[in-house]
């Protein structure tokens, strides 16, 4: 089975891809990101490709949406990921930008609410990143409508109600053990921590 995970940044795409990798899949993370990777999807039977919804081969397409119109049909299953709570999503996105600017290797580490300042929020908005964020979300919605693929939400996938999250995963009808994937996606693995960092210094 060939699976594509396509989501807005900070919707659990990486953890989901890694959980599927443990089910015997070859995993490719963001082949059209900062450092493009050669596309080997046609060479592997069990493969999971994770893409962010604004990434695409810029030498061949004008937009990520146009690219996915051709890309999605090449997979047996595409999972679309977003978040319901846009404010919390934007804060998480700000954290991603902050860590990436400081040290890209730290983007998948824990963070706290007080890590994000109003000055950083203002700077990222002024630099146009909020528009990028909104475009990612809009692309997911458009593709959901075009291909009639329901959007899976972060809040459901990492829900404290693990039976509900299991049912969410099971509905995808993938060639995986949904119990294993559900266990891997336990809410304790979320990057954002409760409380303030200053309390733990």
Residue ranges and their predicted role:
Residues 1, 68-70, 201:
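Short, Lys/Arg-enriched, disordered terminal segments
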Residues 30, 152-154, 179:
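Residue-level detector of family-conserved "landmark" positions at structurally sensitive sites
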Residues 1-47:
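PAPS-dependent sulfotransferase catalytic core
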Residues 33, 155-157, 182:
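Residue-level "edge-of-site" marker
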Residues 49, 53-149, 154-175:
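PAPS-dependent sulfotransferase catalytic domain
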């Amino acid at each position: 089975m060939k699976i594509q995970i396509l989501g807005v940044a900070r919707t659990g795409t990486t953890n989901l891809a890694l959980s599927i990798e443990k089910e015997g899949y070859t995993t490719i993370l963001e082949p059209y990101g900062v450092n493009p990777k050669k596309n080997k999807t046609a060479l592997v039977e069990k493969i999971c490709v994770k893409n962010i919804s604004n990434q695409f081969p810029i030498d061949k397409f004008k937009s990520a949406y146009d690219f996915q119109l051709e890309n999605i049909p090449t997979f047996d299953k595409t999972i679309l990921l977003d978040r319901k709570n846009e404010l919390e999503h934007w804060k998480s996105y700000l954290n991603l930008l902050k860590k990436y600017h400081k040290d890209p290797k730290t983007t998948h580490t824990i963070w706290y609410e007080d890590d994000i300042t109003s000055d950083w929020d203002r700077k990222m908005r002024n630099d146009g990143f909020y528009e990028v964020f909104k475009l990612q979300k809009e692309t997911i919605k458009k593709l959901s409508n075009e291909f009639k693929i329901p959007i899976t939400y972060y809040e459901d996938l990492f829900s404290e109600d693990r039976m509900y999250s299991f049912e969410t995963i099971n509905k995808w009808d993938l060639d995986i053990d949904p119990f294993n994937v559900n266990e891997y996606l336990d809410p304790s693995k979320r990057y954002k921590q409760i409380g303030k960092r200053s309390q733990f210094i």
